[in-house]
Amino acid sequence: TVGMMPNEMLDNLKGMISKRQIDRLWVVGSNNDTAPIIDASFRRLLGILEKHFTSTPYLISNRPSSSDFAMYGQLSQLVNFDPTPREICHEVSLRTVAWVGLIEDQSGIEVDDEQWGSIDTLPSTVKELLAEIGKGYVPAQLANAKALENGDKEWQTEIDGCLWKQKSFPYQAKCLKLSLIHISEPTRPLY
C-alpha cells in the first residue's frame, strides 16, 4: 500500500502524479485568466446546491439517479482531496459536503419507481443548477467544437461576461456530439 512505501518512492510518486495533473490543466481551461470565472461559478454552484439540499436529498428526485453519481464523481474530489476547493465547500455549502458523504455509500437504500418525481415537481433549484451549468459549459463546448471543425488549435469565447481562452480538445467535442444526439433522439443508444 502507499502508506508502507519508502519515503523516496512515495515522494517520486507524489511528484509524478502532481506533474501529470498540473500538465493537464489546459484540458479544463484552468489558468490565471480563467481562475476568477471558475471560482465564481463554483461558488454559485455550491450556493445553489446548499439551497437545493434543504428540500431534497438528491439532485432530481427522492432517490439517487445517474445525475447524482456524475456530480458525486466531480464533487468527491473537490470536497475530500483538493485543499483549496475543500475549504470553499466547507465555507459555502456544508450540505454539499454532507451530500457527498451520503452518496459515497448508497448500498442500503431501498428504491422504487414511486420515488421518481416528474418534471412538474422538480424543485426550482434544478432550473438554477442547469442555468449555472449552461452559462459556462454550453458556450465552451460550442466554441471548442467550432474550433476543431475549423482546424483551430485554440478557441476563445465569452463566459460569464469574461474572455475565456483554451486549447481545443477533441474529447469535449465528442461529448457535445453525443449530448446533441441524446437530446434529439433520447431512446437511441449512444454507443
What annotation goes with each model-predicted range?
Residues 72-165:
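Active-site/pore-lining binding-face segments in mid-to-C-terminal subdomains
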Residues 28-33, 55-60, 82-88:
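Inter-helical turn/loop segments and adjacent helix faces that build the functional surface
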Residues 172:
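Conserved phosphate-interacting/catalytic interface
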Residues 1-41:
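Internal, well-ordered alpha/beta segment that forms a basic, Gly-enriched binding/recognition surface
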Residues 44-48, 55:
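Ligand-binding pocket segment of bilobal, Venus flytrap-like solute-binding proteins
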Residues 181-191:
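Single conserved hydrophobic/aromatic residue that forms the stacking wall/gate
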